[in-house]
Amino acid sequence: MNSKKIIVDILLFILMIIEYSRLYINPTVHEIIGIGLIILIIFHIYLNRNYFKRIKKGKYNFKRSFKLVINITFLIVFILTCIFGILSSQFLSIGSLTTIYLHKIFAYLSVLLLGLHLSTNINPLMAKISYKKIIFPIFIIFGIYSLIQVDFWNHLTGRYGFSITTGNILINSIYYIGIVLMIIALLNLDKLTQKN
């Protein structure tokens, strides 16, 4: 993987996680980061354009089909998150409570899809991780704890605003990273029986 892809992917991950600390950042900063995410995702797609060119080529097994479904679904949900985010902008005054909640619901759905997307794309690396039998259970347990701490289900179903967690932006971000790591671990449980 080239350095540009790595830098863009890391920035995407960091900014996306920060966005879930909506309670702890200025609304204007939240929107600026959102614009940054849109720019980065366009760049990300451009850097991975060869993947899209190969979609119609070759045979599809379950793993490749699953990866394609996750990637396309994640892209669609991300676009919807951006659309409703723009409609909900404090500077446009064209949104409503409905657009705000749809923005939030798609945003929280994106967390789950982010975990699935990363899992399908870094799958080969999982087999190389040492002490998987210790690390994966820790990821899963902490991920479940994080889901509870941020009351993820009620956010996903639109029952609450963007965040009701207490603490600070760092703690809140760690919780969401924990959720992503949990999903990655769950989708790579088969690696526990493989030797490094």
Please give the residue ranges for each predicted region:
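Membrane-embedded alpha-helical bundles that constitute the cytochrome b-like, heme-associated redox core
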Residues: 1-196
